[in-house]
Amino acid sequence: MEEALIQWQERELTQTGHYYKHICWMVVPLLWMSCYFYGPRPLLLCGVAWLVGNLCDRLISLLRRRVYQPKDYSNESFALIIALLMPATVDWYVLVAAVLAGVLIGKEVFGGYGSYPFHPAAVGFVVAAVSWPEQVFRYPQPYASIPLWDASGVAVSSTISDTLRSGGTLNISTLSLGLGEYAAPMGTGAALVLVACGLFLWVQKDIRLSATLSFLITSAVIVFLFPRQVGLDNGPLLMNLAFRLRCVRDELLTGAMLFSAVFLLNEPYTCAHHRLGRILYGVLMGVVTVGFRYFGVYETGVCFALLVVNSISGWMDRTETHLYALLHSRKNAGDTAGKEGAE
């Protein structure tokens, strides 16, 4: 059984391994922006995350007595995603614990490459978020001086989350939101860079627009119709059009929404595989994510929503396959009956 699993994983690696390699490359521009805002510490954090993910891969290969696959970048990609979801001031032990949880609990416990039902990076982030919320959800301001090793003395805040949760609007220009010039996780703020990364991954056929766009459109529609800003939900729709659009901007460009649409949603083994299933997957992600943002206690509710929807993505695939087979069997039966009647 173990030998059959290893052979299956090797075949899958040849088909989907490029996805994780491209994800690692797309981390580079986000990391460059993060270093521009926060200094060299993000580079060191990502380096440690990469090293921990790689060492876990080698250790598991040794324990399971299988050959280490140097072309398998899945652990490293999960580790880098977790690092980019963290603030630049996060303590080292929190980052290491998150990567270990994501790689070992989120991936290897279920059998390793391609066998996991939940996105390992989301698993690692959620474990850290629940265990150390004061470390994960409080962010330094851009251009702050952050020491390389001990960042405990740096001023941090959760202004964005507090403002939106209290029904206020962000006093941040669209350009600043697009560039990521606000307190946020170190790799999720630069919306313009994220769009460019998404376009590259789409050209490489690593992400599917059916899941990404349905997620973003669903989230935008819910926020537009039911904004949490004070007073907007009571006034006429057209009278508050500009303010509602601003609410959509604030919600989609904060809270790692765009980052998740590019780097988390289209993971090959946790996303639905058929087009209709991916659309439904994205719609459910949008509904559950906005629900977590509106009524949850954590700013980056999208990772919690991802785990919820991952639990039924396989069921959506199976349901679509059965419906497709049923419809085509009826169509074929009708065609056969028509031919017999004509004869």
Language model features by range: what are they?
Residues 1-21, 292-343:
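Cytosolic-side transmembrane-helix boundaries in multi-pass membrane proteins
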Residues 1-61, 338-343:
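N-terminal signal-anchor module of multipass membrane proteins
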Residues 7, 55-67, 103-114, 196-205, ...:
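C-terminal ends of transmembrane helices
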Residues 26-33, 53, 57, 75-84, ...:
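Hydrophobic, membrane-inserted alpha-helices
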Residues 39-51, 89-98, 177-191, 243-257:
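Structural signature of hydrophobic alpha-helical transmembrane segments
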Residues 70-75, 80-151:
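Membrane-interface helix-loop-helix junctions at boundaries between adjacent transmembrane segments
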Residues 115-195:
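Long hydrophobic alpha-helical segments that form multi-pass transmembrane helix bundles
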Residues 117-121, 249-257, 278, 296-309:
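Loop-to-transmembrane alpha-helix initiation sites
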